[in-house]
């Protein structure tokens, strides 16, 4: 692969334009002889987690393929699982542009995308068309114009539609770019949401005779006490997995760098240490009762190993993939 050359060209463009251009090309070559240029031979390293069998422990994090447009392309690159979304019940445009910024010196990204997506029905059609044989996770959220007190209704609508097509479902309550969303991580609001989610999961299990695990994605900007409370809620409600972590609002990590004052969530290398520490603390509180999918700043084999040593059973990449390309998948999976 010639990703360094492609990256040089893409990084001359606005980040969102570069993303759209890349996706157009991936869709164009998938299923043709030109797929050879993205296909990689990856070691098979099966992992069982949440009752599912994964080809290898490295997945694509949610947010890159929001609508499930390029599932087969990412599968060809060697991901052991692919998480698509965040998707909402209705299509929405997201926040105003520009809304995505590269912090190149720190290999970070700041985004305030705002759950831009074409809606859950469109995503389901894309999943049905995909030929990828690995686990597909579907990450769900609420529409921006849905009041937060009615947010759980949006999650239940999405669950109804995606359940028969999902390998697992991720409840995203930790994006900083949807007003009020992170309040669902705490106290009664979290318990109320998780209770409704588990009831819906039980109904759908009976309907489809299939158990689809549910994971909850949390933020890195949590105190130790908040992590303890979240872990307790996850255990009490028999949630199947925890994904740690989403992006951070702490911009001190990139102070003085270009775009460091932009609003939105910071991802990539700057969040690496904090994410790993959250995984370590969460692992201690969950006491092996619930597996953790570790994400946040994984940009090397060493960073991947640190996440697993901290307590992650599976890991995901996003920003590291943008900066290092498909070779990062091969480096991690073949040597982990």
Swiss-Prot record:
GO terms for molecular function: dihydroorotate dehydrogenase (quinone) activity. CDD domains: DHOD_2_like (cd04738). It comes from the Bacteria. Gene3D superfamilies: Aldolase class I. It is found in: Cell membrane. Pathway: Pyrimidine metabolism; UMP biosynthesis via de novo pathway; orotate from (S)-dihydroorotate (quinone route): step 1/1. FMN binds at residues 62-66, 86, 139, 172, 217, 245, 268, 297, 318-319. Keywords: Cell membrane, Flavoprotein, FMN, Membrane, Oxidoreductase, Pyrimidine biosynthesis. The keyword Oxidoreductase applies. Catalyzes the conversion of dihydroorotate to orotate with quinone as electron acceptor. This is Dihydroorotate dehydrogenase (quinone). It comes from Photorhabdus laumondii subsp. laumondii (strain DSM 15139 / CIP 105565 / TT01) (Photorhabdus luminescens subsp. laumondii). The lineage of its organism: Bacteria, Pseudomonadati, Pseudomonadota, Gammaproteobacteria, Enterobacterales.
């Amino acid at each position: 692969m010639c990703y360094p050359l492609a990256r040089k060209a893409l990084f001359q463009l606005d980040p969102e334009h570069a993303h759209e251009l890349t996706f157009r090309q991936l869709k164009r070559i998938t299923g043709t002889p030109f797929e050879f240029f993205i296909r990689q031979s990856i070691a098979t390293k099966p992992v069982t987690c949440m009752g599912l069998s994964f080809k290898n422990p490295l997945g694509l994090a949610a947010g890159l393929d929001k609508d499930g447009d390029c599932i087969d392309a990412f599968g060809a690159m060697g991901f052991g699982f692919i998480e698509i979304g965040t998707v909402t019940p209705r299509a929405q445009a997201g926040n105003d542009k520009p809304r995505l910024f590269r912090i190149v010196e720190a290999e970070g990204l700041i985004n305030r995308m705002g759950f831009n997506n074409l809606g859950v029905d469109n995503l389901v059609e894309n999943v049905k068309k995909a030929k990828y044989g690995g686990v597909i996770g579907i990450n769900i959220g609420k529409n921006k114009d849905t009041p937060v007190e009615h947010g759980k209704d949006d999650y239940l609508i999405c669950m109804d539609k995606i359940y028969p097509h999902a390998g697992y479902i991720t409840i995203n309550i930790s994006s900083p770019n949807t007003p009020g969303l992170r309040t669902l991580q705490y106290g009664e609001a979290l318990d109320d949401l998780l209770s409704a989610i588990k009831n819906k999961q039980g109904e759908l299990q009976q309907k489809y005779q299939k158990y689809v695990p549910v994971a909850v994605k949390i933020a890195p900007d949590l105190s130790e006490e908040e992590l303890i409370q979240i872990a307790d809620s996850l255990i009490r409600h028999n949630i199947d997995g925890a994904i740690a972590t989403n992006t951070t609002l702490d911009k001190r990590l990139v102070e003085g760098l270009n775009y460091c004052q932009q609003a939105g969530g910071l991802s990539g290398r700057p969040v690496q240490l904090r994410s790993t520490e959250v995984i370590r603390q969460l692992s201690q509180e969950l006491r092996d009762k619930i597996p953790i999918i570790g994400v946040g700043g994984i940009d090397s084999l060493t960073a991947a190993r640190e996440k697993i040593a901290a307590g992650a059973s599976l890991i995901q990449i996003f920003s590291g993939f943008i900066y290092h390309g498909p070779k990062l998948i091969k480096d991690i999976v073949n040597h982990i």
